[in-house]
Amino acid sequence: MTTNKLSIVAYNTDKGLYYANNQRDYNKQRVSIYSGILVNGGQPVDSEHKSGWYFLKGEDKITSVKKNQSGGYGEASWKLLDDSTHIDGVIPKVLTPTEADEFEDDCEWYIGQGSKYYAYRGLYKRVQERLPNIEVDVEFEVDYKGHIEYALVENNYKDMKIRVSNGSSWTPKVMEQSLTSITHYYELEELLTPDIVLHNRPCYITQDTTYNIVRNYIKENINPKHARLTSDYDFCLTVKKVIHIKPFTKSTEITKSNGRSYAKPQFKTQTISTKEVEIFEMCPSKKYQNYTPIEGFKGNSLADLVENMKLYLDHLMGVINTPVEECTSCGGLGCTYNKIDDINIRGE
């Protein structure tokens, strides 16, 4: 048995009432309360803190739900296109549908041959006034779940966007995704916690999404003077330090296309002023060769997750973009930099 009754869930706070549709879509997201609905005499006001929820400031109950409904159309008539063609007793200004013997054909209305004014049909047009919308009551029920602290509802990251990199280095593609759409909560937390305050509970971002976030952040913030990407794919990424060294000249033999030397050996020379040392590597959840699968971002709450993500990304780029100098003690056989042993570890 189906019903058109609107089912609402609501929570009281010290500042007003939060309410939402009890119905959910196939993604387990709350269905919006459809347009044209009036709750307590006004349009639903979207909650600033949680999508799919609405807020009644200073109120603690829902007393009425109405919807705007079309008032329909008034009675149709046929009026002269030009009043100057009116002739008393011959060509009236207005014809009723009966006088016009009107009929419909293919969604168009016509004056019928049975009308004595049929000969003047080209002088008329059919008009029908649209009546104002009317408000009608909507049957509803409210499940009041109790009182929650307003501070628990506050969520400053509801509309936060995250830039995520997808595709290989030769087909780069960056997308903006909402933080809430890529954040996951543990099943038990979802079962025990109202969704309006779920952002206060432990959450995480998957390894694969974390990989794409870190990958894009590196690409957008790397300083090419001090580091460069040597592998940039959707299955692995490598960053190497660019180390400026004392320039030296290197000679390389030029060979034939078959790899053999010329009768008189030929050489090309080049000046080497930099060398590269690997500083960071990662891969997504699927292990690739000797790359390290990156761990997903985690947090004790959504705010904590955002803070952990920011701290990690800032720390990572600080390490990657820090200049590295040639070691004066070994004459260029080594280099000095602060090694970060936990570079692939996320905060919890």
Curated annotation (Swiss-Prot):
Belongs to the Caudoviricetes Gad1 anti-defense protein family. It comes from the Viruses. One of its GO terms (biological process) is symbiont-mediated suppression of host innate immune response. Counteracts the host Gabija antiviral defense system by suppressing the ability of Gabija to cleave DNA. Keywords: Host-virus interaction, Inhibition of host innate immune response by virus, Viral immunoevasion. This is Gabija anti-defense 1. It comes from Shewanella phage 1/4. The lineage of its organism: Viruses, Duplodnaviria, Heunggongvirae, Uroviricota, Caudoviricetes. Binds the Gabija complex as an octamer and inhibits its ability to bind and cleave DNA.
